[in-house]
């Protein structure tokens, strides 16, 4: 019997293209599914430089009549991940410096065309191309691939099932309705009962409306997005499709993120069996960031996008107070985002030389060494579908201080302040409610009180390092889902209500312009 085959349709996949956690998640899941016996491939754009990083390139098809002009589909192998890739080549659309944004940090004006072309390529594969197996499952990732289920439905391809995974509902791919003809979306689907939301064509809504099944990346986030507060205008549709929504938690690459063998750490590697060696990584981080060489200092790290979603506005208020109240506190920050927050954090570092350091930007080596050297990680967020960064921190013995939202409410164990210090012997981190500076500041204070109790702190570190968040665990629910979909007869068209959009939170209103969905670093 032939193996089940799935084709993941995505805008990015590590290591060929990555802007954030989406790229990590796609590759991590694809590798786990492949190990479990699913014939798994990845379809994505051939961005600048991608073809130089793959081997065994073979021509599959010339695709005429595509949004954005003629394109070529090639197959290749990525030697770093061991996965087969199918790359959509159209230099006019994809040969650019950035994946999604121009030099001014704005979404490319033709993002609707760029990612509609990707969806049309997936539909052509589903219809059948010589030299390429037709997949049983088309697995669309986030809004960039949101048109895939719609196009498969419109083409009447009943033998191919579609799944949409929502990584971040706040980023929806919303474009002027007038572009529908240009991107090949039939007018019958551009209605309030179809892909239209707020008078615009919405790629995420298209996926949610027409996918056979929907998944999202944590249990708590699945509950949240069915509420007006977190549903970003799509909660009525999500509630209508609740029976088709499966919360399947993400995983992390526990081989890549392993302090015992991390190539980014070199001689600084350590493990849960010899956590005392973490002190060497702490000393190295202090030296690299220009912090005072003090093993007794509590070293708090922050590594995320500097945006309102990630509560950078709260951090710039809470951290100065924390540094003032706690003379032994040190802070090391890496990240990039809104310039006003970058400036304020750089000013904070100038005010506290030797105790606070900020690196604007991001690179993998610094990120790994940040987790290795830190005692604790600050990860505030107004919404967080999953939350990879706190899991990386736990893996490296850095205790997370995080908002009680999304996936972090599922993955971080915190018995609560009312239970007393001894209850924290079973904890893996500290969670806080609210999005104000006092809320974050109180959580930092609480962490420092626990840090002053070595037995409790070491227990929290060990608990976090022992947690199993690898992709092999996350892959099994997808195996069950795919098996059920392939074996079961295809359902009839799922009715959806006429949507009366819920009021949008401010952060969501600013996110509906075709922006990418960059998850946490």
Swiss-Prot record:
- One Pfam family this sequence matches: Glyco_transf_5
Q: Which GO terms describe its molecular function?
A: alpha-1,4-glucan glucosyltransferase (ADP-glucose donor) activity; alpha-1,4-glucan glucosyltransferase (UDP-glucose donor) activity
**Disulfide links within the chain:** none
Residue numbers binding ADP-alpha-D-glucose: 18
Keywords associated with the record: Glycogen biosynthesis, Glycosyltransferase, Transferase
Known InterPro entries for this protein?
Glyco_trans_1, GS/SS, Starch_synth_cat_dom
Task: Tell me the domain of life.
Answer: Bacteria
Pathway per the UniProt entry: Glycan biosynthesis; glycogen biosynthesis
Q: Which reaction does it catalyse?
A: [(1->4)-alpha-D-glucosyl](n) + ADP-alpha-D-glucose = [(1->4)-alpha-D-glucosyl](n+1) + ADP + H(+)
Q: What is its EC number?
A: 2.4.1.21
Q: Which GO terms describe its biological process?
A: glycogen biosynthetic process
Q: What does this protein do?
A: Synthesizes alpha-1,4-glucan chains using ADP-glucose.
Tell me its family.
Answer: Belongs to the glycosyltransferase 1 family. Bacterial/plant glycogen synthase subfamily.
Name recorded for this polypeptide:
Glycogen synthase
